[in-house]
Amino acid sequence: MRHGYNLPMEYWLSLSPLPGVILWILLYISDYYFTIYTARGFRDLGHFRFEGSFELTPQFQKDVDLLKPVSKRHIILLVLYSLLIVFIWWLTRQFYFFPWTYLFYLGMFLLMEVGIHLRHLRNASLIREMRKGGGLDGEIRYRKWFSYRISASEFYTFAALFFLFAILAYSPFFLGGAVMCFATGFQHSRLARKAKTSPVVMESNV
């Protein structure tokens, strides 16, 4: 393969912005609907309460709490990020080392969503098992700072895994995913510290 990287997938992704945009659209849309599904599932089970909101991303908390099937903010960001991917592809092709730089940024977008989907699948599996056979009694209350801290730990784990792949495969795509997951984990660690020192707000069933 050219440019030192050795994954055919990366060569295919760098030929055009279209594959990256399509993957991004699919992942971003399914991310939102997985969130709605799991939020509704935890609400129906009645065993889980989350301080403030089940959703950790502030700009989506209201829509998720209302279980909106369509989010105007989500659609706007979907379009903007899709255009940004196309712009990055064009910009790196014109002015920067290509395709290494584009693959790095594309990995930031796509692999963070992969990590998020792994969490969605875990939650969906938990909900399905509890609906089938129970297995949990009483009520579990998640403080906001604890939810952020658990999320940070998971993102740090994903970052380490993607970084290992990046080293073994000499992959800018996985390196981008590692950087983005680490940055998100760091952000959630800061939010956890902030939430722990903030007054307790209303608790939500989802």
Predicted regions and their residues:
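Hydrophobic alpha-helical segments at protein termini of multi-pass membrane proteins
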Residues: 2-206
